């Protein structure tokens, strides 16, 4: 397998990419042996556009309802919303989209991207992306703790939507100064 990867996959995947910047993550969580209903109930993915932002913002295709807080499809989306709202509330931008990308088996996101759509101040998008990595614990455990996701709130999200309701912790803007130190 290593020979096939070296000879065929890597040259195509890395074409035009500087080798110093390339990171190839191949099954970092190890052997995957559990499947079927024991590993996945199949109860997600029914309301993707309704549960997110419609066609206004892109999303990775992962559903929220039916997943617990350890699944970054759900908790990562909540954390991205939380960070974006706090960036705007702190005055770093008038408009903001935060993208978090995770790889299976990796605790930290493989990508953190802040896009202020040109509405940011002196701290450019790259600067804000770096500050977000430093200011927030973006591991699943860190997100669960920050947003108190072990509380029984999920019936309310399924019935009334996941975003735009101030009673959810990811809508809180009380920590808008968290980024200022970075």
Feature names for model-found ranges:
Residues 3-4, 45, 74-78, 82, ...:
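Conserved active-site and cofactor/substrate-binding residues in soluble primary-metabolism enzymes
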Residues 2-48:
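Accessory "access/gating" subregions that flank catalytic or transport cores
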């Amino acid at each position: 397998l290593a020979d096939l990867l070296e000879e065929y996959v890597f040259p195509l995947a890395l074409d035009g990419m500087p080798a110093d910047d390339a990171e190839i993550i191949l099954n970092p969580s190890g052997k995957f042996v559990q499947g079927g209903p024991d590993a996945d109930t199949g109860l997600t993915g029914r309301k993707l556009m309704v549960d997110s932002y419609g066609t206004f913002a892109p999303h990775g295709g992962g559903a929220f309802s039916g997943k617990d807080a350890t699944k970054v499809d759900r908790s990562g989306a909540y954390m991205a919303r939380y960070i974006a709202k706090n960036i705007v509330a702190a005055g770093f931008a008038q408009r903001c989209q935060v993208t978090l990308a995770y790889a299976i088996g990796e605790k930290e996101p493989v990508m953190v991207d802040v896009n202020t759509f040109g509405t940011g101040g002196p701290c450019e998008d790259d600067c804000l992306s770096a500050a977000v990595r430093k200011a927030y614990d973006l591991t699943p455990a860190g997100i669960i703790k920050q947003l108190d996701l072990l509380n029984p709130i999920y019936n309310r999200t399924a019935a009334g939507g996941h975003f735009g309701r101030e009673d959810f912790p990811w809508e809180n803007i009380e920590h808008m100064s968290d980024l200022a130190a970075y």
